[in-house]
């Protein structure tokens, strides 16, 4: 991570389904840590804590929004999630941050609060019809495919 050592902010995010077919931030954090370990041959490079920081405050800095989000602090937007920790892959949990980065998946999220508003509770989206959104997305994708053929 020579760029981080030089003081360059590094953020982790998803580019969208068009680039990697996955919108899972946990997978993005995991890959950020694993790929740097692979490239450098150093298992200590990009720790779980560093990957989490890159995905939270690092992402907020990349967007120029570190004063409003990216960390849990008074005066910032109340954007939080709760995850299930009763999955076999998460037991025993010695280091919560390590487990968050290396074993958690997007479908482990059971509660999502954005700016203080509950968007999902018990894995059910409360603010929109998820089935309809999926149906509309598939229809739009079909239209794009037909248009480019």
Locate each region found by the language model.
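His/Asp/Glu-enriched, well-ordered alpha-helical/loop segment
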Residues: 2-88, 101-105
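Active-site microenvironment of metallo-dependent hydrolases
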Residues: 53-149
């Amino acid at each position: 991570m020579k760029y981080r050592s030089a003081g360059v902010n590094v953020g982790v995010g998803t580019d969208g389904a068009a680039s990697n077919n996955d919108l899972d931030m946990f997978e993005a954090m995991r890959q950020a840590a694993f790929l740097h370990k692979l490239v450098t041959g150093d298992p200590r490079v990009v720790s779980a804590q560093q990957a989490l920081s890159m995905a939270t405050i690092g992402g907020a800095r990349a967007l120029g929004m570190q004063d409003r989000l990216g960390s849990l602090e008074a005066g910032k937007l109340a954007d939080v999630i709760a995850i299930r920790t009763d999955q076999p892959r998460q037991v025993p949990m010695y280091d919560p941050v390590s487990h968050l980065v290396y074993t958690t998946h997007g479908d482990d999220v059971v509660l999502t609060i954005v700016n203080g508003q509950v968007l999902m509770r018990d894995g059910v989206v409360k603010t929109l019809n998820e089935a309809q959104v999926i149906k509309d997305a598939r229809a739009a994708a079909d239209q794009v495919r037909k248009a480019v053929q």
